[in-house]
Amino acid sequence: MNKILFVLLSLLTSLQSYSQEQNEKEVSFLLLGDIHYDLLEDHDMEWLSTKPDDLRQVTKEYSVFTKNTWPEFSRIISGKVQKHQPSIKAVLQMGDLSEGLAGSPQKAIQMANSAFKAVNKMNLKVPFIMTKGNHDITGPGAKEAFEKVYLPNMARLAGHPSLQSANYTTTLEDVLFVCYDPWDRNPEGLQQLEKSLAGSKATYKFVMLHEPVIPVNERCWHVFRQDNAKREQLLQIIASQQAIVLCAHLHLYSVVCRDTPWGSIVQILVNSVIKDKNILVPKNVVADYGPEFVTAHPQWQPS
């Protein structure tokens, strides 16, 4: 598991805020993907039993992963934050902190509190900046729990007095992090994203969101995949502001660079669902990026 976390750290080390010529300070940020923190007691099992595939994932996967790997994984995260050099200035989490699917409003509140209790237990001593994931708002009462439990905790952990939504910015050192919520019904969300990026004097700019901007596997999952106009606008904003995309959702590790008419976009996609701490070498490595994703996996229909 140490090696798994080292991979995440090494990805960010290459993006450290420093320049020897300008004698700037070296800093690091620890990047986490989906976690899907899950305790069986946080589910209405009668409700969940009506959804066989969700029941399987909860009982056979995420609750098991949480029990078997989260205690050690969280200790490693805490240790890296304390000892890693250059020093880690923040932990960045790309959404799906919890599994969701609690089954009732009461259980949704309970699940949200359990997830943040797990984060608090790490006692990180640095900002914990997170974005909204689809599982964080899935199930009866989940959206209300996000408003009531998630947003106050997100504000506290990131060092903000309060948050009205999952669209917010945090600046640390010379680095800007803009959390973007594509599910927000605010029609001016993209304009606000552009304003946040353009209005910052930070040298390094990151856009944090759960779903990838650039699809990287045969499922072709990416934000705004059913809204070409918004997708083009998002690509233009990110590329023109030379921002780097940080995302998750696919439970994969990926680094890609895509050319657009407005410039290149670099995207880093990570995963923190640890199924087996003893798997230290990737089983499948894809070095070429192109349309062969679709033809190589005909069983998948791109969405």
Across the structure, where does each feature detected by a protein language model lie?
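Active-site glycine-centered loops adjacent to acidic/histidine catalytic or metal-binding residues
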Residues: 34, 95-96, 133-134, 210, ...
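Positively charged n-region of N-terminal signal peptides that target proteins for export
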Residues: 1-4
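Short acidic, glycine-rich surface-loop motifs adjacent to enzyme active sites
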Residues: 200-218
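Bacterial N-terminal signal peptides
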Residues: 6-14
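Short, solvent-exposed loop/turn elements at domain surfaces
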Residues: 27-29, 37-44, 186-189, 216, ...
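Histidine-centered catalytic micro-motifs
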Residues: 208-213, 243-253
